[in-house]
């Protein structure tokens, strides 16, 4: 009666040892890699930053900040079309915080501006303003957009809004 128990115990030990031996080596922690990417960005080493950011999103597909930074770097490197794809894919994610949504729409506006798709850039800024009507950057961007297009009526209107926003921000400081 003890022989079957010993055989089961030996098989169990061999199974556990095999599991741990063939288990993939633990990858570096996502946050550590993300920190390395941010450090590379600070140093101006965008290629290394992009490599680290790709590693982060391979390990954690929910790391929205890594995707945002990746898209921003691609745009800065002249690949705005790839940046649009990355940033656009983030818009369909559920349960994003407002500050993340603001960053996504800002990035998309800049992507579209670089591609000279001003109507789409405007749409993204307007979506941003729906989330935060007093966003200084968005109002200034929209003003510059209307000035580029020669739409002076809308530029005047935004200019007035911008003055109000600046007054509110000055009084809060």
Language-model features: locations:
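N-terminal signal-anchor transmembrane alpha helix of single-pass membrane proteins
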Residues: 1-26
């Amino acid at each position: 009666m003890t022989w079957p128990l010993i055989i089961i115990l030996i098989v169990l030990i061999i199974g556990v040892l095999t599991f741990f031996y063939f288990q993939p080596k633990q990858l570096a922690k996502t946050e550590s890699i993300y920190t390395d990417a941010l450090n590379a960005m600070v140093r101006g080493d965008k290629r290394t930053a992009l490599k680290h950011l790709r590693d982060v999103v391979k390990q954690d597909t929910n790391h929205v900040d890594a995707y945002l930074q990746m898209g921003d770097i691609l745009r800065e490197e002249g690949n705005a079309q790839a940046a649009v794809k990355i940033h656009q894919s983030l818009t369909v994610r559920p349960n994003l915080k407002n500050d993340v949504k603001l960053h996504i729409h800002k990035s998309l506006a800049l992507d579209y501006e670089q591609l000279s798709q001003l109507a789409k850039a405007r749409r993204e800024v307007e979506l941003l303003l729906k989330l935060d009507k007093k966003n200084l950057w968005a109002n200034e961007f929209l003003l510059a957009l209307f000035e580029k297009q020669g739409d002076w009526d809308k530029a005047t209107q935004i200019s007035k809004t911008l003055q109000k926003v600046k007054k509110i921000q000055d009084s809060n400081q």
